[in-house]
């Protein structure tokens, strides 16, 4: 069998293709990287610390690519991003220590998998419900909202409630938002803890938290989330690499595929209404939750076929949602060109 980077050619092609799909999701949603990569590596039989550490290293590389594109679109709040980094750093170290402690007890793999099932399932249900109910207030003009002041009617009720608690010091953010520093640091620590424990960038929790809890406009929430993930992913992957938890034969082909996908996904935020895709993203989270649960059942009952089913679910969910992003982008581009062609001279 031909081997490249120490892995088989088929596995290499799988990683490159998977990286492409995840890059699209990462650039478009500001999330969608390691919360799919880490479970996939666990399903493929990699040790917990390698799955977590390699997931973080992948997140770091992909977030750099996507952040550069969002910076060009003016969708990064640097003040908010720097404050998030402060709380995230401590959370990552705490999460890493928990993983290493659980490994000494032989419980890391099972507990990480169960946590994934609960988090992905819960957030997936919430996002899907919000999308079906249409509570996001309609379409999102990604370019227009980057610098415009936020309309109070577009801020989620829970974010309005949180903003009403004026616990000093208060921080002014883009879009005319003012929120307590302690809320920002609290969200950052919680997502940092998840980054270190689960090997995720925290984006699948941080981006919704920035929007639903703090009231940051969706485009800025995505761009700022990615900016923060550059640092959380970098710090996390460095800490794991120091303890032999990063496998470059995994990370390199994933990054090769994601480089193109992340640029495309980031560009798509300026032309595609996220509400059109949100329900599919919620279903993808639910698919990931079911996939990890099936893997655990396969391990418990010693049924390898369930591991295969789990991997197919993870890859299939990524393919479905990234495909919808590409399809919606093409539809919007065609619609825009059609409108230009009928505009009178």
Model-derived regions: residue spans:
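Small-residue-rich hydrophobic segments that form or flank transmembrane alpha-helices
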Residues: 2-104, 110-115, 119-121, 125-132, ...
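Serine/threonine-rich low-complexity intrinsically disordered regions
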Residues: 8, 141, 151, 156, ...
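Transmembrane alpha-helices
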Residues: 115-122, 299-345
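Flexible cytoplasmic inter-helical loops of multi-pass small-molecule transporters
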Residues: 133-162
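A contiguous, mid-protein "functional segment" used to position or interact
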Residues: 267-313
């Amino acid at each position: 069998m031909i081997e490249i980077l120490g892995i088989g050619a088929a596995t290499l092609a799988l990683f490159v293709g998977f990286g492409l799909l995840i890059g699209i999701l990462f650039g478009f949603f500001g999330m969608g990287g390691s919360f799919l990569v880490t479970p996939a590596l666990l399903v493929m039989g990699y040790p917990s610390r390698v799955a977590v550490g390699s997931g973080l290293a992948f997140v770091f590389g992909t977030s750099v690519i996507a952040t550069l594109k969002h910076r060009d679109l003016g969708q990064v709040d640097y003040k908010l991003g720097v404050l998030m980094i402060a709380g995230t750093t401590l959370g990552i170290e705490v999460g890493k220590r928990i993983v290493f402690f659980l490994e000494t007890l032989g419980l890391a793999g099972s507990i990480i998998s169960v946590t994934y099932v609960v988090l992905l399932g819960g957030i997936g249900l919430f996002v899907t419900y919000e999308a079906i109910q249409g509570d996001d207030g309609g379409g999102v003009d990604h370019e227009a909202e980057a610098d415009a002041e936020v309309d109070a009617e577009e801020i989620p009720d829970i974010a309005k409630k949180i903003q009403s608690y004026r616990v000093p010091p208060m921080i002014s953010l883009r879009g005319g938002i003012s929120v307590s520093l302690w809320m920002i640091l609290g969200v950052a620590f919680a997502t940092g803890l998840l980054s270190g424990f689960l090997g995720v960038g925290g984006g699948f929790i941080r981006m919704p938290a920035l929007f639903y809890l703090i009231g940051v406009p969706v485009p800025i929430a995505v761009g700022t989330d990615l900016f923060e993930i550059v640092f959380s992913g970098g710090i996390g992957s460095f800490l794991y690499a120091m303890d032999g938890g990063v496998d470059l034969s995994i990370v390199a082909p994933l990054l090769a595929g994601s480089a193109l996908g992340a640029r495309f996904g980031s560009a798509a935020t300026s032309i595609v209404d996220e509400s059109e895709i949100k329900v599919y993203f919620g279903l993808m989270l639910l698919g990931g939750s079911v996939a990890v649960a099936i893997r655990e059942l396969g391990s418990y009952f010693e049924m390898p076929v369930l591991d295969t089913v789990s991997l197919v679910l993870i890859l299939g969910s990524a393919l479905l949602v990234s495909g919808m992003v590409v399809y919606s982008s093409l539809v919007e581009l065609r619609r825009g060109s059609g409108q230009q062609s009928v505009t009178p001279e």
